[in-house]
Regions:
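N-terminal assembly/interaction segments in proteins that build large macromolecular machines
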Residues: 1-185
């Protein structure tokens, strides 16, 4: 594909020579319209957009291109999101949901046992709160036992369908946030 006085390959090679870094072009697209504009946020070549319009309006085009860059989409719509991204997001959502469900069960069990969960949410807090006299060594031992027991029991008995439903909801929210056509004003 020609570009200026050479090809795109020539431009990539020239740029590699300037920066001293190996560069590769893994793909390209042609953007066509009656008027095409670009936006390069702060001139840093990190957050850029190219937008084509059906008629020329420099101010509107600049504002739209800038807004698209600010929205930072990864695709136009859900169909454009790579399956690998969706799979990674669903796995993150599943793990996060499981951790939250276990944490909720632990906090409920601690409260039921008469222990404030915020006093025993980490080893540092346990030591600090014992030094302040807010909890006793017996409370810490009881809390550690509750945390270990409830965590293991809850993790082993999480309802899979509930986890999947919550994870799917999180994936839907993610897609709404990263797909240009799904983002809200």
């Amino acid at each position: 594909l020609s570009m200026g006085k050479g090809t795109i390959q020539d431009a990539v090679t020239d740029r590699s020579g300037i920066t001293g870094e190996k560069m590769e072009l893994d793909g390209y697209n042609v953007v066509e319209g009656a008027y095409t504009t670009t936006y390069n946020h702060m001139g840093k070549n990190q957050l850029c957009t190219i937008v084509a319009f059906n008629k020329e309006s420099e101010e509107v085009a600049h504002n739209v291109a800038m807004q698209i860059a600010a929205m930072n989409p990864i695709a136009i719509d859900e169909a454009g999101v790579p399956e690998s991204v969706k799979e990674q997001e669903i796995q993150v959502a599943i793990e996060k949901t499981k951790a939250e469900q276990v944490q909720k069960a632990v906090e409920a069990a601690l409260k039921k046992g008469g222990i404030n969960p915020t006093h025993v949410d980490s080893e540092d807090h346990m030591e600090s709160n014992m030094a302040k006299g807010w909890i006793t060594a017996e409370d810490v031992a009881k809390a550690k036992d509750i945390i270990a027991t409830v965590s293991a029991e809850k993790a082993a008995n999480l309802p899979e369908q509930m986890i999947q439903n919550i994870a799917q909801g999180r994936l839907s929210k993610f897609l709404k946030e990263v797909c240009l056509l799904n983002q809200e004003d």
